[in-house]
Amino acid sequence: MYLILQDNDVSRYIVEAVEEDNPEVTVIYQPAMIRMEQENLMVVKRETVEEKLGRDWDVQELHLNLISLGGNVDEDEDRLELSWVL
């Protein structure tokens, strides 16, 4: 599955958090966007993003920077999880 964000300051902190919580993630920097790919499961954790940003962060804020995503989405107030079940 994949997650594509606009390439901006907030997204860069989100990418750092995703890399910390998902060590196997592949990050691809492209013009104006950042694509993250991972097999099976990718998690964006509120707590980790808050640590990187240095402020409170609502998982719904991810949608402000989101270009596209692929996979099954499970979202609550603490995390957004993308998975791929065959």
Per-region residue spans from a language model:
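A short linear hydrophobic-aromatic micro-motif
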Residues: 23-27
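N-terminal start-of-chain detector that recognizes signal peptides
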Residues: 6-11, 52-56
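Short glycine-/aliphatic-rich beta-strand segments at the starts of folded cytosolic domains
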Residues: 1-4
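Short amphipathic alpha-helix segments
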Residues: 7-21
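Helix-rich interaction surfaces within compact, conserved domain-sized segments
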Residues: 30-33, 37-86
